């Protein structure tokens, strides 16, 4: 028998908590035996004194086990259960292509995703732009679509990791969100509750990233890779660039359109292609679906080129309640804004740098993102044809096209876009799309 206040005191004094103490405290979070004040106090103690790797693994697994842990054995799946998670960015539409691509190569992808908050877009919000798509299906339907189609992208159910829901809301109100240990446990507890065989983790770097510096992003990536592998899930973390919008657009329905264009081959943004292939190839390798990276990439290109990945996306949409002809006729179903108009820079030169966070906030201002949880979204608004760093910009070249519902909203977004994209006489140095892979062998 432990006392919550003694566990808090121990961590406050910089000592190491045992797995049993952590399990006791997490159980108290779930059952309300531990008060909000005590949760806040432990969060602050961890923020200042951190946790070692054993503590992080114990916290992650205790939170994972605080609710339902999905079990796929009864479905007799004939392939590995694999997934991807991103720390979030702007124009990050990867999940919509990666899930069907991995499924087309023999994997099963039960992807639990979130909604957008702040400047980052949420995968679930993109699917909410599709009429009829159920982002919160019954567990029976979720399992059926995973088995029959190979991929289902849905929201977190109430019985999955309840400890994280309570802990996170308190961290958000007590300035302890930025702890690497607590971020690691929050992300991984939800992913590991899906009983994955393998996970590819996309940790963003740059002006649109969650973490403020490359060093902080790398520290988080290493922590996630170490804890996930320590908890028994094969995991690789990739450090990927978010110094510019990842796709050529940002906004929910607009990103769905770009995802379908990617899957069908109508248009594949080269940066989006590079990061999607890097993450998806790693999933195939970790899941034993490819012998090496070249084999993985060949398989992925094949399912893109023969239409299998696009077909699976369509089956997932219809399986979860969306239109059966969505891939073929998406323009019939996706909402469109009243005003669609280009923005031009005031100077000529090269797109030199981008405040990606500000571009994400411009989408929020248009109505495409949330200022606070529960806000209603306008799925039609956002930005398209966003220039890439290094693009030559002149008086006839738009730096973006704004999709807005009013002249006032357009004017606000236009001002934000012009301020966020810096034009210079000198072209910037090219940065890689993927900075590093952190595999189990690198830890």
UniProtKB/Swiss-Prot annotation:
Record's catalysed reaction(s): thymidine + phosphate = 2-deoxy-alpha-D-ribose 1-phosphate + thymine
GO molecular function: 1,4-alpha-oligoglucan phosphorylase activity; thymidine phosphorylase activity
HAMAP family: Thymid_phosp (MF_01628)
The family this protein is said to belong to: Belongs to the thymidine/pyrimidine-nucleoside phosphorylase family.
Enzyme type, top EC level: transferase
Any one Gene Ontology BP term: pyrimidine nucleobase metabolic process
Xref: Pfam families: Glycos_trans_3N (PF02885), Glycos_transf_3 (PF00591), PYNP_C (PF07831)
Record's subunit section: Homodimer.
EC number of the protein: 2.4.2.4
Keyword Transmembrane helix: no
Protein's name in the database: Thymidine phosphorylase
InterPro entries, sorted: Glycosyl_Trfase_fam3, Glycosyl_Trfase_fam3_N_dom, Glycosyl_Trfase_fam3_N_dom_sf, Nuc_phospho_transferase, PYNP-like_C_sf, PYNP_C, Pyrmidine_PPas_bac/euk, Pyrmidine_PPase_CS
Species of origin: Shewanella oneidensis (strain ATCC 700550 / JCM 31522 / CIP 106686 / LMG 19005 / NCIMB 14063 / MR-1)
Function: The enzymes which catalyze the reversible phosphorolysis of pyrimidine nucleosides are involved in the degradation of these compounds and in their utilization as carbon and energy sources, or in the rescue of pyrimidine bases for nucleotide synthesis.
Alphabetized UniProt keyword annotations: Glycosyltransferase, Transferase
GO cellular component, one term: cytosol
Biological pathway: Pyrimidine metabolism; dTMP biosynthesis via salvage pathway; dTMP from thymine: step 1/2
